[in-house]
């Protein structure tokens, strides 16, 4: 009790009152300073303090927006730490474990949500909800393989990999990014299945040329095995996908439950592993991410923080001056978030990062191997579990090879400072001084279970044509 009394000895009554609703018991001093800074802003607005207290004291009751002026960069500094205001106060009064603004969505009643970019921003913690990971529907794998070998996509996949441009195309966020093109899969005329978005010629890619994506299926292939009725992949998937079981008989009226084996998605202990490379040399051990928020930076942190992968600690006897210089510029590096079934990469470094994600490229209508540049202070969604689930569900009826091809989508490559591709003198990621490879465990393990259920491929998987 003595320590608590000393803590609040110089605290104003208004701050004390608001701290009474604080959640969690960590970082008392930081929370006090955050609330004190807020009180000073709200006192200038008539009725704002009363409205905030009403919202905090009656969580289930409707409340008005409680706003503060938006700063130039949108962030608020509290005791040497900068953060987004709605995240700070949601952390203080609702969710102490909140990591990122990607975990929050405003309620419809909020007139000044952070994302609206207005001059005022609402910090009422009860005007935001936390994003929950959507439940992915199981993939229905046919028990008896009725797949026609003539429909095999293996030849198409091989042709694609042989004809992929020697140097990947490049795109820069946000300049090259538009709404995904919703050209549907070519399906047979009588197909009862809704179209899925794709892009037959990668319309958003610079100088589009070459073969179609492995996900554009020839018109004579059998229809997808299962997919949700709403075409949500061209949207930003802000609404959870309907995963109720009653959609299965509507979509698959001719397939009984005895003919298919459902294979469910399971969340692994570690959502990803990260491996660090210098040129074509792997350096150090893999980092296994258990925290949904992971920092990969160029510093040294001997504390063995489970949410931080410090590249500065790793040594390499083959390191040259170019690598040394690049490592010095990694700085704060990249912040990886895994939120609501989506993976985001936020560039914290002063230098850009460069990302090759087939899932992200598919969503934006780029060629699968396109390398996307993410400038400093920008954030990009690089993987979406729901879109992957829909692709996997469609692929099972196209044979083992079609499903196996999706393993490429579960690995994301990212270089620091130096880019690669058609617009750079480095043609391949292994020519960049410092890069990481991210393996997404959940999707990979799901693929493994589906492939095991499907049995052997009709043709052996081989690197030899």
Swiss-Prot record:
Phosphorylated on serine by BMP (bone morphogenetic proteins) type 1 receptor kinase. Ubiquitin-mediated proteolysis by SMAD-specific E3 ubiquitin ligase SMURF1. SUPFAM superfamilies: SMAD MH1 domain, SMAD/FHA domain. The modification N-acetylthreonine is found at residue 2. The keyword Transcription regulation applies. Belongs to the dwarfin/SMAD family. Transcriptional regulator that plays a role in various cellular processes including embryonic development, cell differentiation, angiogenesis and tissue homeostasis. Upon BMP ligand binding to their receptors at the cell surface, is phosphorylated by activated type I BMP receptors (BMPRIs) and associates with SMAD4 to form a heteromeric complex which translocates into the nucleus acting as transcription factor. In turn, the hetero-trimeric complex recognizes cis-regulatory elements containing Smad Binding Elements (SBEs) to modulate the outcome of the signaling network. This is Mothers against decapentaplegic homolog 5. It comes from Homo sapiens (Human). The gene is SMAD5.
């Amino acid at each position: 009790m003595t320590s608590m009394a000393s803590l609040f000895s110089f605290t104003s009554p208004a701050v004390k009152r608001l701290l009474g609703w604080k959640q969690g018991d960590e970082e008392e001093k930081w929370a006090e300073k955050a609330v004190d800074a807020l009180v000073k802003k709200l006192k200038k607005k008539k009725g704002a303090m009363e409205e905030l207290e009403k919202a905090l004291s009656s969580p289930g009751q409707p409340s008005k927006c409680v706003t503060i002026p938006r700063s130039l960069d949108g962030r608020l500094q509290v005791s040497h730490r900068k953060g987004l205001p709605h995240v700070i106060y949601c952390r203080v009064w609702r969710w102490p474990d909140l990591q990122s603004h990607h975990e929050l969505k405003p309620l419809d009643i909020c007139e000044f949500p952070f994302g609206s970019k207005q001059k005022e921003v609402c910090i009422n913690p009860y005007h935001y909800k936390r994003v929950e990971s959507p439940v992915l529907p199981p993939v229905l794998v046919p028990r008896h393989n009725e797949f026609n070998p003539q429909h095999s996509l293996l030849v198409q996949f091989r042709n694609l990999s042989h004809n992929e441009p020697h140097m990947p195309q490049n795109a820069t966020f946000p300049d090259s990014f538009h709404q995904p093109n919703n050209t549907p899969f070519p399906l047979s005329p009588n197909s009862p299945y809704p179209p899925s978005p794709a892009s037959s010629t990668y319309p958003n890619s610079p100088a589009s040329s070459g073969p179609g994506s492995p996900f554009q299926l020839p018109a004579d292939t059998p229809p997808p095995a299962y997919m949700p009725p709403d075409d949500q992949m061209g949207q930003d998937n802000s609404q959870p996908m309907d995963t109720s079981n009653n959609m299965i008989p509507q979509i698959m009226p001719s397939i009984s439950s005895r003919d298919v084996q459902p294979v469910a998605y399971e969340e692994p202990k570690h959502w990803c592993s990260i491996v660090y490379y210098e040129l074509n040399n792997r350096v150090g051990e893999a980092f296994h991410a258990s925290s949904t928020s992971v920092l990969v930076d160029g510093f040294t942190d001997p504390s063995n923080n489970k949410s931080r992968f410090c590249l500065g600690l790793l040594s390499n006897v083959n390191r040259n001056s170019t690598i040394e210089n690049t490592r010095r510029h990694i700085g704060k590096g990249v912040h990886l978030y895994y939120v609501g079934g989506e993976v985001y990469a936020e560039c914290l470094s002063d230098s850009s990062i460069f990302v090759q994600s087939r899932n992200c490229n598919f969503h934006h209508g780029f060629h699968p191997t396109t390398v996307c540049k993410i400038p400093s202070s920008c954030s990009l969604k690089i993987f979406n579990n729901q879109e992957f689930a829909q692709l996997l569900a469609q692929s099972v009826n196209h044979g083992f090879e079609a499903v196996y091809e999706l393993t490429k989508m579960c690995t994301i490559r990212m270089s620091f400072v130096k880019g690669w591709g058609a617009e750079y003198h480095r043609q391949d990621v292994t020519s960049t001084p410092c890069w990481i490879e991210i393996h997404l465990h959940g999707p990979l393990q799901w693929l493994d279970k589906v492939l095991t259920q499907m049995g052997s491929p009709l043709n052996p998987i081989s690197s030899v044509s």
